[in-house]
Amino acid sequence: LTDFYQIIHHVPASPSVRTLMQGWLIPKHFQGQLRMQEGITVNGHYLPMSAPVPADATVALHYQAPMPTIAPAPGATDIVYEDEQLLAINKPAGMKTHPNKASDTDTAIARIGQYLGQPAFITHRLDMATSGILLVAKDPLSQAIINRQLATKTAARTYTAMVDAAIPDCGTIDAPIGHMGNDTRRREVRSDGLPAVTHYQVLTRNAAYALVRLVLETGRTHQIRVHLAHIGFPIIGDPLYNQTPGPRMYLHATEMTLTRPFAPAQLKISCPPTDFMV
């Protein structure tokens, strides 16, 4: 276990330490650990969870958690956002988010670890063939806060894809997704699958292709890829769901909206694709 310290300045008044923790979306198991170890101090003094927090206080959190063990790897990282708790990069297509086997040494998370000088904490994943915003946390508490926002849909991700020009202007794809037979990689729409909903809108189009904005209500594996293929408009270059090959799969994580850990401010991270041919 590694010791972590979180110091938050200029905290607004709160009826109790517990209310403050809940407002920060700190998971209950972290709250329990902080309470048991007296790891919460307000203006330098320990306060019980029921005690009020004065205005403009400095709150320090001390806790222990495992440190990720992914080894750092040298390589360029295209950083699109960074603050004290979070880092977002523009992941290139063709790079894995994290290693799946021992030989996977050059991954996005390994390069981020090299840049930070410490391992990063994963909050979500992108398929190897998908480019765009990949957000990590610099500490386990911020990771837990972002994961909770993603799970409760208070954080939102927007994608851009390139498909055949004939796709309708907009639509909602509400179709359950499950494994394709015994294939461990591929998914398909099937009645016994998990619920999956994708909204799409055409942004622009030319004679050959349409640029489509996509918002997910659910987060199934390959959801966008499977849903677009299901309605007859697979992503251009998709190696699993489009029989026509391309130079890359034209799917990009374009935008992410969330609440910053330990701050009331909404954060919007944007990273438009630069190589889509529309």
Regions picked out by a protein language model, each given a short descriptive name:
Residues 1-278:
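RNA pseudouridine synthases
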